[in-house]
Curated annotation (Swiss-Prot):
Binding site for GTP 2: 185-192, 232-236, 297-300
The keyword tRNA-binding appears for this protein: no
GO molecular function, one term: GTP binding
Binding site for GTP 1: 10-17, 57-61, 120-123
Protein's name in the database: GTPase Der
Species lineage: Bacteria, Bacillati, Cyanobacteriota, Cyanophyceae, Synechococcales
SMART domains found in the cross-reference section: AAA
Domain KH-like residues, every copy: 356-441
General function of this protein: GTPase that plays an essential role in the late steps of ribosome biogenesis.
Pfam name, any one: KH_dom-like
Residue ranges of domain EngA-type G in the record: 4-169, 179-355
Family recorded in the similarity comment: Belongs to the TRAFAC class TrmE-Era-EngA-EngB-Septin-like GTPase superfamily. EngA (Der) GTPase family.
Subunit structure: Associates with the 50S ribosomal subunit.
Amino acid sequence: MPLPLVAIVGRPNVGKSTLVNRMAGVRSAIVHDEPGVTRDRLYQEVEWNGRRLRVVDTGGLVFGDDSEFLPHIRQQAMAAMAEAQAVIFVVDGREGLTPADVEVADWLRKQPLPVVVAVNKCESGQMGLAQAAAFWELGLGDPIPCSGIHGNGVAELLEAVLAHLPEVTAEAAGEPDPIAVSIVGRPNVGKSSLLNRLVGSERAIVSPISGTTRDAIDTVVTWEGQPYRLIDTAGIRKKNRVQYGIEFFSINRAFKAIQRSDAVLLVIDALEGVTEQDQRLAGRIEEEGRACVVVVNKWDAVENKDTHTINEFTREIRDRLYFIEWAPLLFVSALTGQRTHKIFEQVNTVVAAHRKRVPTAVVNEVLQDALAWQSPPTNRQGKQGRIYYGTQVADRPPTFVLFVNDPDLFKDNYRRFLEKHFRQNLDFTGTPIRFLWRGKSERLVGRAVRKLERSLTSR
């Protein structure tokens, strides 16, 4: 059963995102003392007293002004209302009732949804009651004083809104766990357009202005029965071009989005090719051990393509992103939809590899085959490397322990050969793999292996 949805609306800078973060118990939406910080619809799950719901945070509503992003923000708020079963109307208790609040209230009265008025920034209990009383004249029911910063009144607010929603417990909401997929890249490479193409609706504001998306935005979409949590992030810039403030928080949020992803779509601009920032971002994905698909966007805009063009682009990308050469490439157009239908297929492939577990017997068969192809190196003193045994100790990413006589005997070129051999024989497309080299004498290997296997079976 899908979770009921509550839309959070109000004029700019009344603390909607702070209140949403308090309800959800996380700091997801960017919170900053600047009007218009939240531009898109941001979804989060909330659990309260065994009940579950989703809330959608929207940008600040301003009527009668069509400058900058304001029409887009109104469009996003209306889309949120179309999905929702109830509304929390957030106002500022410190400022009191304003004409802008009255405009929003007039608009809400025309909507066929129950409305709960949350009077935010009421840090004092007794004073909060007096502050909330000023909003009775809106005619939208009992205003509830609360504080997104301190948390007081939030329980009462949740109880009030849950009274308007169908009861869905944590158990009743059971469904396959969504695969978390972050969409990252430099500004203006088409991340939000790609998200909208995958979702099939204008979920995030799409604009040619660099830096339109400020938050990491989560959208859940289901494809062939599998839910995916798509995370659209602010474009990554060089540090010396980032001013401290909103964009600083957005870039930090984008890196954190990579951390909480199962797979990452690294979006490259086909017209600009791989840049230094793309390389740094790819390095971050590898460091975090995340599965990855490299999505080359704007392929429709590449002129004079022939049968060799895609191979030439592939060679250039592989040369510049050599440290994630294991990541599959997709040449797509978010604008026309060209090949975007293959993205979910590729995500499934790389996530399966990222989560793969290989039996110990198979690991050692592959090791013996590798040794038959290329013997371990010998140092200048005539001492040759020996690999006694290997076993997988973790997934996400797949991680193997190799017991050897001396790890220093195995230089980078042999380690790369071994990784390539594992990839060819065990199909680790789209995921980094790790090797932990443990020096042991042959006499002690059996004891170490038994100890390791006992620790794995006790987990």
